[in-house]
Amino acid sequence: MQTSLHENGPVFNIKNFSGPLDLLLSLVKDKNIDIFEINLVELATQYLEIIKKLQDDKIDLASDYLVMAATLLQIKASMALQGEKVDEEVELDKERLLMKLAEYKQFKEISQILRYQEEKRKEIFLKKSSPAEEFIRPIDEKILDGRSSMVQLVLTLRQMFERTFAEKLRRTKIDNFNLTPSDQVLYIKKLFNENEIVTFEMIFSLPSLSHFVITLIALLDLSRRQELLIYQDQQFGTIRIEKGPNYEE
């Protein structure tokens, strides 16, 4: 069932969203603005209006939507009461929420890339190839030289992960981790406190897709900022990670 926030406004179907962060991210995208530049009071107001409208229409909402509504209401009320001089604790709550939203955005983007690659791989398996095509491989497609694109890094690291943990993945149950990409940034940097060069196996140490995606987001962020450089000299060869020019201890 779809509900409209305003008579001529956008139509929302709560089933289109995977959770409150997904709904918030959609509202941010509509404003076409960076997450950390968003007016949180305005965003909170819009979110709360949607939740109220859904409740008025007697639509069942998962508890996490209501928890987020309570969180936003508290932050909004605190910011309104304190005016320009916002309490440090309120500011921290605001930063935590925006950071969580930014991390969710990264997670969603990576998941979409992985999903796209999965579909492309299925197409390749279904496609009937000629004997000659089986031996053709695009030049340097799987070589990492420290300046590879984000997409190439994702695809290569995903392939290496599946190759390394192929057997264990078949026996591993779906799991939930409380780790965040920020936690994994600290973990990766801890490895560099003890090693000049870190390998793929040292970073991706668990046969879990959830752990892989969370750690991948952390590694890609460090690579994007050129804190780390990622190398692989040949397809399925050792992937090594080294400190980049912008590395911060």
UniProtKB/Swiss-Prot annotation:
Domain of life assignment: Bacteria
The keyword DNA repair is annotated on this UniProt entry: no
Gene Ontology, cellular component aspect: cytoplasm
Keywords: Cell cycle, Cell division, Chromosome partition, Cytoplasm
Location in or out of the cell: Cytoplasm
One example of a Gene Ontology biological process annotation: cell division
Subunit note: Component of a cohesin-like complex composed of ScpA, ScpB and the Smc homodimer, in which ScpA and ScpB bind to the head domain of Smc. The presence of the three proteins is required for the association of the complex with DNA.
PANTHER family in the record: SEGREGATION AND CONDENSATION PROTEIN A
Function: Participates in chromosomal partition during cell division. May act via the formation of a condensin-like complex containing Smc and ScpB that pull DNA away from mid-cell into both cell halves.
Family as reported in the entry's similarity comment: Belongs to the ScpA family.
Listed name of the protein: Segregation and condensation protein A
Organism of provenance: Mycoplasmopsis pulmonis (strain UAB CTIP) (Mycoplasma pulmonis)
Source species taxonomy: Bacteria, Bacillati, Mycoplasmatota, Mycoplasmoidales, Metamycoplasmataceae
